UniProtKB/Swiss-Prot annotation:
It comes from Rattus norvegicus (Rat). One of its GO terms (cellular component) is peroxisome. It is a multi-pass membrane protein. InterPro entries: PEX12, Pex_N, Znf_RING/FYVE/PHD. Residues 1-19, 77-109, 184-249 are peroxisomal matrix. The gene is Pex12. Component of a retrotranslocation channel required for peroxisome organization by mediating export of the PEX5 receptor from peroxisomes to the cytosol, thereby promoting PEX5 recycling. The retrotranslocation channel is composed of PEX2, PEX10 and PEX12; each subunit contributing transmembrane segments that coassemble into an open channel that specifically allows the passage of PEX5 through the peroxisomal membrane. PEX12 also regulates PEX5 recycling by activating the E3 ubiquitin-protein ligase activity of PEX10. This is Peroxisome assembly protein 12. Residues 48-51, 140-144, 278-359 are cytoplasmic. A zinc finger (RING-type) spans 304-343. One of its GO terms (molecular function) is zinc ion binding.
């Protein structure tokens, strides 16, 4: 007991303070995850707008909701955000003595938890929305889309003029705080941590053991739930925990994949890439009829390949580029879900009507 007390009294607050490289790395982790997921959703939406267009249109809101579930899960169970926990860090209530510090497995107090969640989730969402608004207003102002009598025109001009200075001030504030942190003049590398009333520290062996012990206890303790309200609350809690755990596992794998891509495209690996990609270009594929009764292309370009008559209401298939009569190709695609010539999978939304000057 005496040795434990001596260790506590001699330990300084800065003993567990992470380096600038650790805190910058964990800051950049979620910053890299967002555009990566956004690109994946964009590719899916472009390939199948009917199924994935919703996720592209509401990506910011869906990402913010999932990010909130993930961060709330980690803040309440590990006293850290996902990226902080990934790098072995935790949040400590500022000003608390080592004797009164909560274990990381107990989570943050409610006040500090909600402040941290707001700065981790809500603030980036608002920042993204402001950036999109500024980009849209610049384009509209450049092409003079706003009418001269618009009441909002003056507000748009003021916003566009002030936004770069606000952004510069914001980034300068963060840069100044990081410089003070490097020089040992501040215990927070980010002003948002100070506003949330917490600071970052390293996880100790006791913290890791306590979190592992809590997981074992949670899986072992399964109390019978009696009331319907408690059943619903327990089910929601398990669902949120399951979603957060799935996101955590997926992001961990995704982070590894991003680091692999970073290594793959690094300058040191360029010679390896060139040796692997320096292969002859394969010849273009020879298109074969996808079945025996596939119609042959007519010799005259104005004839529909399906009805063998002059085309009416020219319609092109976006999947293959061939032109048909609208009624012919509409009925065919609706029945077979494929291009009549190539057999490529095709849906009705891939029909594009052509309006030529002759018509």
């Amino acid at each position: 007991m005496a040795e434990h007390g001596a260790h506590i009294t001699t330990a300084s607050v800065a003993d567990d303070q992470p380096s600038i490289f650790e805190v910058v790395a964990q800051d950049s982790l979620m910053t890299a995850v967002r555009p990566a997921l956004q690109h994946v959703v964009k590719v899916l939406a472009e390939s199948n707008p009917a199924h994935y267009g919703f996720f592209w249109r509401w990506f910011d809101e869906i990402f913010t909701l999932l990010d909130f579930l993930l961060q709330q899960h980690y803040l309440s169970r590990t006293s850290a955000s996902f990226s902080e926990h990934f790098y072995g860090l935790k949040r400590i209530v500022a000003g608390s003595s080592p004797q009164l510090q909560r274990p990381a497995s107990a989570g943050l107090p409610k006040e500090h938890l909600w402040k941290s969640a707001m700065f981790l989730v809500l603030l980036p969402y608002l920042k993204v929305k402001l950036e999109k608004l500024a980009s849209t207003l610049r384009e509209e102002d450049e092409y003079s889309i706003h009418p001269p009598s618009s009441h909002w025109k003056r507000f748009y001009r003021v916003f566009l003029a002030a936004y770069p200075f606000v952004t510069m001030t914001w980034e300068g504030w963060f840069l100044t705080q990081q410089l003070r942190y490097i020089l040992g003049k501040a215990e927070h590398h980010s002003p948002l941590l100070k506003l949330a009333g917490v600071r970052l520290g390293r996880l100790t062996a006791q913290d890791i053991q306590a979190m592992e012990h809590r997981l074992v206890e949670a899986s072992a303790m399964q109390e019978p739930v009696r009331s319907i309200g408690k059943k619903i609350k327990s089910a929601l809690k398990k669902a949120v925990g399951g979603v957060a755990l799935s996101l955590s596992t997926g992001l961990s794998v995704g982070v590894f994949f991003l680091q692999f891509l970073d290594w793959w495209y690094s300058s040191e690996n360029q010679e390896t890439i060139k040796s692997l990609t320096a292969l002859p270009t394969p010849p273009p594929p020879v298109h074969l009829d996808y079945n025996s009764d596939s119609p042959l292309l007519p010799k005259m370009k104005t004839v529909c390949p399906l009805c063998r008559k002059a085309r009416v209401n020219d319609t092109v298939l976006a999947t293959s580029g061939y032109v048909f009569c609208y009624r012919c190709v509409f009925n065919y695609v609706r029945s077979h879900q494929a291009c009549p010539i190539t057999g490529y999978p095709t849906e009705v939304q891939h029909l594009i009507k052509l309006y030529s000057p002759e018509n």
